């Protein structure tokens, strides 16, 4: 099918579903935003406004790297038979920086037929002393990068390819970000920015890669950091630079070895690097460089060995992605908690799928009976206990529905090392679902919580992680996208770090549950899972999501929201406000695993209508572990 036609059909389907769920006015509002972005917001949309760049130049006028007040950053760039057009555009992007704190270190391994590379560089050197150059023998990308590093005199290093373009404010922004980290008392050893892909001109970028803050599980699935990465030269020297045996994935290897030393990284949500897409570049996919995949798996296996963890590294669901199948430590028992009121057809489907499909054997199931009124329900419980060996049914003593209270009550009967909160209207799809949830938690350095991929019966995504701030409070990642897709930057097809996952299927270490006090019963219906995950995150633990645990969620796409019932609407509004009161509105609206340049109105990871942070050159940075 023609790609444009396919995309048009997908958008039409999304518009129809959005109209059903949230009404015509909402659909029209979002549609208008989409048209604005596509038709009127393309040119130079990721660059700061001209007046911002002029202000930066004015601030730095007459200053040198020594007295500009910014840390010096030496950019390492191996050259190899670089086309003149690409080389001049790259060199121009360096000399036209708004701040003088950069040094460009060029190691030229071009062959004799490309002597023009040296001539062009020397032409620039006569005008700009901040460019240093050495002709070298070609020993591969890592060794050539190491040769460039030998020329560096800066406190920090950065990596740049010879055919790409630096944003004009790259050195200024990274220098200011380092100073900001120091002022905040945070580690300043390793930073990275966002990037954009382009073909002909950075005035017309193709797409931006708006990245999350440091996400360790994501980094083990793909090198999402890429460009522009800046790190202390002392760290580079300590770890020995890049490893030639990792050519093809040498930067990924470097970043993993850096975070082994720093314990984390800082993210600057500004587009500071433009990655050229052309035949032979990795920005066009690893099909252009097949050796990358083999190198990446070696890099990941080496990282596991250095950090004392065990698992198998495999190809991921898509090219350029990978999967660590962690070895599960011991034989942890999982207590599955399922609240239920009547709805025995749903419950039977859920229980039958657990007992007939689950490959992990060490589990118990506790159904928490919550005020059922149909006598047939209790007959069903009696029959189910006979049919499903070890099934427990416990009676919640309170009246009304309080999801938090029901699960807190059920925990009293659980004997597992892990608790699994599970809705009664889900059905297991793959045999290893529980094993895969455990893989993310039951190993040294694992997450405390892991969520699953939940699909609607029509094979669209219901849940692929929770993003706080969407719609003002919280929303689901990639909701309504067709199953089997990669999502934004592979984020629907790789293990992810999130601030929260849905309580419809949530695995948590029992010790962590007890440490934070279980679910907050003031959140009776809404946001109890979000609040719980945020308290776990704030206690220093990670929350992961895996696409390798899949369940069908029979929650209706078109079910009425709480806002349609006045009583429920008041309760929902109160729980919304409590979420702000407990965690702070600013924290809810700024999810570290969701870039501020992405939309807050939709659940599709599309670009925001509001890119003022980019246009103003706003510098915000926070280190995360």
Residue ranges and their predicted role:
Residues 154-165, 416-429:
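Short beta-strand-to-loop acidic/aromatic patch adjacent to the donor-nucleotide binding site
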Residues 136-152, 396-414:
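Glycine-rich, basic loop-to-helix element that forms the pyrophosphate-binding segment
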Residues 169-205, 426-473:
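Conserved donor NDP-sugar-binding/catalytic core segment of glycosyltransferases
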């Amino acid at each position: 099918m023609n790609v444009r036609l396919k995309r048009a059909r997908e958008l039409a389907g999304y518009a129809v579903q959005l109209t059903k769920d949230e009404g015509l006015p909402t659909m029209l509002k979002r549609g208008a935003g989409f048209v604005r972005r596509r038709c009127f917001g393309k040119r130079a949309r990721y660059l700061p406004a001209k007046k911002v760049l002029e202000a930066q130049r004015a601030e730095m006028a007459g200053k040198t790297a020594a007295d500009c007040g910014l840390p010096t950053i030496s950019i390492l760039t191996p050259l190899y038979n670089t086309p003149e057009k690409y080389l001049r555009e790259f060199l121009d992007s360096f000399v036209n920086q708004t701040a003088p704190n950069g040094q460009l270190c060029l190691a030229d391994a071009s062959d004799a037929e490309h002597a023009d590379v040296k001539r062009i560089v020397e032409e620039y050197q006569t005008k700009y002393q901040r460019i240093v150059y050495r002709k070298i023998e070609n020993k591969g990308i890592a060794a050539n990068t190491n040769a460039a590093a030998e020329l560096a005199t800066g406190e920090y290093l950065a990596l740049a390819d010879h055919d790409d373009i630096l944003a004009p404010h790259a050195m200024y922004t990274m220098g200011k970000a380092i100073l900001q980290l120091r002022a905040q008392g945070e580690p300043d050893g390793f930073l990275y920015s966002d990037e954009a892909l382009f073909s002909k001109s950075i005035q017309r970028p193709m797409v931006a890669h708006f990245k999350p803050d440091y996400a360790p599980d994501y980094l083990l699935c793909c090198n999402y950091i890429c460009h522009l990465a800046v790190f202390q030269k002392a760290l580079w020297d300590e770890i020995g630079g890049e490893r030639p045996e990792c050519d093809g994935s040498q930067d990924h290897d470097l970043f993993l070895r850096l975070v082994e030393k720093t314990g984390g990284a800082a993210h600057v949500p500004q587009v500071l690097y433009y990655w050229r897409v052309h035949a032979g570049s990795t920005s066009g996919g690893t099909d252009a460089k097949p050796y990358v995949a083999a190198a990446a798996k070696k890099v990941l296996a080496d990282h596991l060995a250095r950090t004392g963890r065990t698992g198998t590294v495999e190809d991921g669901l898509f090219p350029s992605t990978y999967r660590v199948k962690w070895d599960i430590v011991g034989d942890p028992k999982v207590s599955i908690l399922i609240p239920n009121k009547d709805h025995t057809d749903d419950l039977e489907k859920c229980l039958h799928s657990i007992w007939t499909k689950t490959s992990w054997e060490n589990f118990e199931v506790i159904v928490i009976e919550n005020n059922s009124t149909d006598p047939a329900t209790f007959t069903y419980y009696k029959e189910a206990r006979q049919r499903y060996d070890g099934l427990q049914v416990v009676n919640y003593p309170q009246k009304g529905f309080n999801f938090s209270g029901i699960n807190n009550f059920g925990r009293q009967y659980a004997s597992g090392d892990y608790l699994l909160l599970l809705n009664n209207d889900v059905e297991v799809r793959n045999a290893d679902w529980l094993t895969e949830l455990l893989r993310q938690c039951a190993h040294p350095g694992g997450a405390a919580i892991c969520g699953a991929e939940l699909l609607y019966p029509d094979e669209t995504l219901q849940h692929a992680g929770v993003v706080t701030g969407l719609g003002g409070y919280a929303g689901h990642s990639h909701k309504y996208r067709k199953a089997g897709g990669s999502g934004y930057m592979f984020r629907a097809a790789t293990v992810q770090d999130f601030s929260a996952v849905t309580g419809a299927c949530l695995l948590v270490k029992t010790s962590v549950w007890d440490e934070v006090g279980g679910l907050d019963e003031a959140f009776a219906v809404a946001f109890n899972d979000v609040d719980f995950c945020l308290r776990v995150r704030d206690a220093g633990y990670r929350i992961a999501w895996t696409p390798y645990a899949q369940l069908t969620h029979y929650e209706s796409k078109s079910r009425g929201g709480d806002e349609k019932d006045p009583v429920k609407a008041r309760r929902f509004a109160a729980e919304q406000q409590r979420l702000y009161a407990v965690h702070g509105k600013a924290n809810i609206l700024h999810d570290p695993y969701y870039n501020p340049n992405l939309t807050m109105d939709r659940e599709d990871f599309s670009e925001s209508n509001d890119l003022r942070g980019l246009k103003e050159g706003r510098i915000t940075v926070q280190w995360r572990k």
